[in-house]
């Protein structure tokens, strides 16, 4: 393993992670409603969940998200390495500017070679982006970074440390498995992806880790077929993160409609995953979770507002939003319960 020379190691990575959605408490409802609308709450939560640094990472692969994949240009190994490093340095610089990042030494428990290499890569990248280095010093640090980043698979470990601060081997292994499944399995509906991450601690942060890792892979990918698979995985993960950003708003609406905890967000995802939403299907799902006709009608109103708010990228196509709203309003007009 390459030794790091003269790199400042007084860094606390766990101080730079973006704040996930906070738990909702019913006592907050009236006060929040008086200050800000439910729609604005949800929009703020979406923005908070995605974060500026992630958009910086995804900027280069915007063409892939729009379906305009790169032509089959052959990068040399040196060009691939340079692209990866430049993307890493941009991300590190952005995080430092946003949060004033520092790095804490690894504990003895973090003896995983991948994590140790990732720690050294982050420290080197931070030193290089800090500026004020002599040419010789910069050249020495760059040489060390070249050696470490020449090995494959460092990205996921780096992003895990940046986002979570402390990562163990089991967490890193589970992220590797999930990332490969996200790339390979293009048939699984979004609702099932959500159920796979539902019990994860720090699930928003972990999905962000996967997004950054897939974005990095796509940024240097040259095979058109692989570009398509990576771009599709990126879209799926981005949609999943957008829905996770609605969690706090869904908790608020669960309290308003007297629903069991953790039922509304899965319902939104199930609705989105229906190719065509039928009123009978929707009626069965809603009556299973409401306690009265009053709460049923209130839930319909909340869902109507939600689906008017949800960003376009959450839907399967440009017509789905309107079809869902039409079905919700059909149920509201025609159905009399209890």
Curated annotation (Swiss-Prot):
GO terms for biological process: protein transport; secretion. GO terms for cellular component: outer membrane. Keywords: Protein transport, Transport. Disulfide bonds: none annotated. It comes from the Bacteria. InterPro entries: HrpJ-like, T3SS_TyeA-rel, TyeA_sf. It holds the Pfam family HrpJ. The keyword tRNA-binding does not apply. This is Secretion system apparatus protein SsaL. It comes from Salmonella typhimurium (strain LT2 / SGSC1412 / ATCC 700720). The lineage of its organism: Bacteria, Pseudomonadati, Pseudomonadota, Gammaproteobacteria, Enterobacterales. The gene is ssaL.
